[in-house]
Amino acid sequence: MNMFRQAVRSFVRYQSTTSLNPKILPFNAKETPIPKCVEAVYHAPLKIEPTHRDLIADIQLRSYDNENLDFFSSFVLRAGYYLGIPMKGPKPLPTKRKRWTVIRAPFVMAKSKENFERHTHARLIRLYDCNTELVETLLSYISKHGISGVGIKCNLYQREPIDLDSKKDGPELENIDISSQLQGLDDVVGAKVVELLNNPEFKKHLQ
């Protein structure tokens, strides 16, 4: 392909104020073919389409620099693809803006103010149709190879049946030793507690 006749190696800008100067290294593509893993870097990350759309987790990435954020989002999508995790995203979340107003200096410059502003960019990646072990493997991998200035937050979703039998899990009232629980109480208070626990109207609410 003509687009791969020359290898363009772009260096990631870890500071948004630095200039980006890509280096072009000419070579003969027939003599030095580009491996498939390197060629895939020039394309968008591959994704596995979810079949059941069962949401397992979502990963939120936050950073003050959107360039590092987009770079790390692409890294997370590529790692999830090779682990076989169906993923959606990255979805841009609203940018949070925070401003401060402080004095320039004490004494002479006390009446002069200076404003500072901070932008927090965020991306959302959703994980579908996988188990928690794969999610933990992905989180440990991206945490180990994370870049500075990008925060990771993960929300896991677990589903439980709603028809649980509470009688099997909870202790029965007949097996509770009330006397051992009331040793440190007053006799009058203990008698009132025993009377309340033996009340049939009160037992209805505990079943």
From Swiss-Prot:
Q: Where does the protein end up? A: Mitochondrion
Q: Could you tell me which residues form the transit peptide?
A: 1-14
A Gene Ontology molecular function term of the record: structural constituent of ribosome
A Gene Ontology biological process in which this protein takes part is: translation
Question: Which UniProt keywords are given for this protein, alphabetically ordered?
Answer: Mitochondrion, Ribonucleoprotein, Ribosomal protein, Transit peptide
InterPro entries, per database record = Ribosomal_uS10, Ribosomal_uS10_dom, Ribosomal_uS10_dom_sf
Q: Which Gene3D superfamilies match?
A: Ribosomal protein S10 domain
Q: For this UniProt entry, what's an example GO CC term? A: mitochondrion
Judging by the UniProt lineage, the source's domain of life is Eukaryota
**Family, similarity comment:** Belongs to the universal ribosomal protein uS10 family.
What does the UniProt function comment say about this protein? Involved in mitochondrial genome encoded proteins translation. Involved in the binding of tRNA to the ribosomes.
Assembly behavior: Part of the mitochondrial small ribosomal subunit.
Q: What is this protein called?
A: Small ribosomal subunit protein uS10m
Source organism: Kluyveromyces lactis (strain ATCC 8585 / CBS 2359 / DSM 70799 / NBRC 1267 / NRRL Y-1140 / WM37)
Q: Quote the gene name from the UniProt entry.
A: RSM10
